[in-house]
Each structure stands twice: as C-alpha cells, then as structure tokens.
A protein has these predicted regions:
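Conserved nucleotide-sugar phosphate-binding/catalytic loop shared by glycosyltransferases and other
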Residues: 6-14, 31-79, 165-169
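Conserved donor-binding/catalytic core segment of Leloir-type glycosyltransferases
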Residues: 185-186
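Short, well-ordered alpha-helices that flank and scaffold nucleotide-derived cofactor binding pockets
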Residues: 25-28, 32, 112, 116, ...
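Active-site-proximal region of nucleotide-activated glycan assembly enzymes
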Residues: 5-8, 36, 44, 115-179
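Short glycine-/acidic-enriched loop or helix-start segments at secondary-structure transitions
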Residues: 20-23, 49-50, 69, 109-112, ...
Length: 186
C-alpha cells in the first residue's frame, strides 16, 4: 500500500478484559493526540466496548488453533482464514499507518493481514509469559512492547524489537487513586 493515512491507527484485540482494557486505554491516549483509531475485536470484546462512543469498532471473530478435537481444529482453521480475509478488507479500507496487536486469538489474523499489506504492526504483551498468538507473530512484528524486560518466551534474536513500556493503565484507575490520596490528606 502506498498512501497510508499517517493519523490512523488500528488496534486489534482479543475479547477478554486483559486484552480489551489496555487496548481501550491505548485508543483513548491516541485519540487525545489527534489520531483516528479503530478497534478490531470479536463478539466478546464488543460487550466491553459497545458503551465507548467515539471509537469505530469492527467485529471480526476468530478462533484458536489449540483445539484437542480434530473436527474443531479443522473448523478453527476455516474461521481464522475468513477472519484473515475480513481483516484484509478492513485494513485496506482504513489504510492505517500502524496496527497494534494487543494479544488474543482475535488479533492474530489482523496482524497477519497487516503484514500482507506491508503495514507495520506492533504487538503488546503485558504478561510475564508471552501469549501464544504474540509468540507466533513475533518474527513478523516491527516491535514488541512489553511490561517486563525479562519476559519468558522471547528468543534473544528478537531482543532488538523489544521496547519496555510497562503496563497500560486505565485513566479511571489513575483518577481513582488521585481521589483516594486527596481524600486521605484532608
């Protein structure tokens, strides 16, 4: 893709709170800095995010390949493939300058689609052990933002991609802490 929108960011995230809330906090921060932000997530993620106006949400269900049943594994491969195709369409239309993969199986096909379209993607890992989706995406990622320097599961050959950012904390939590501190002093 030649003509990227320098002020647009796509955030791809799995549907659990551990992925969604850092993604939402990151999105709000980018919006404050005049970036257009879109979030791609699955149905679980939409349950958390549907109340948050101002951010364009894209539904893109995916699946995990870590199934014990061969029939479910086979079905998962098809779901992931169709999620990848949908991701290509979303990214082509949005034309972002970068994609953030926040982990979870819903972010995997989006990041692979970004790589296909030559859009750089950054993965974020806030756990001490790299997640499975992020581990498979690591060789293709532009950078990996981590909360802990000594993250388990990242080979030394990827050290040049690692940026220690710490945990992304929701503004509501920071504001709550300020209120508590202020109340205790007075």
């Amino acid at each position: 893709m030649k003509f990227t929108n320098k002020k647009k960011i796509i955030i791809a995230t799995g549907g659990t709170g551990g992925h969604i809330f850092p993604a939402y906090s990151l999105a709000k921060n980018f919006i404050k800095n005049n970036y257009a932000v879109e979030i791609i997530t699955d149905e679980r993620g939409l349950k958390y995010l549907d109340k948050h106006n101002g951010i364009k949400l894209n539904l893109n269900n995916s699946a995990t390949i870590f199934k014990k049943n061969i029939v479910n594994l086979f079905l998962s491969v098809f779901v992931i493939f169709f999620s990848y195709i949908k991701s290509l369409v979303i990214l082509y239309k949005a034309n972002p300058s970068v994609v953030f993969g926040m982990g979870g199986h819903a972010s995997f096909p989006v990041c692979i689609a970004a790589k296909t379209l030559n859009i750089p993607f950054i993965i974020y890992e806030n756990n001490i052990q790299i997640g499975r989706s992020n581990k498979y995406l690591l060789p293709f990622a532009f950078k990996i933002f981590v909360s802990y320097r000594d993250l388990f599961g990242i080979e030394n050959k990827h050290d040049h991609k690692v940026v220690v950012t710490g945990n992304i904390i929701r503004e509501e939590i920071l504001n709550f802490k300020k209120k508590i501190i202020f109340q205790r002093r007075h």
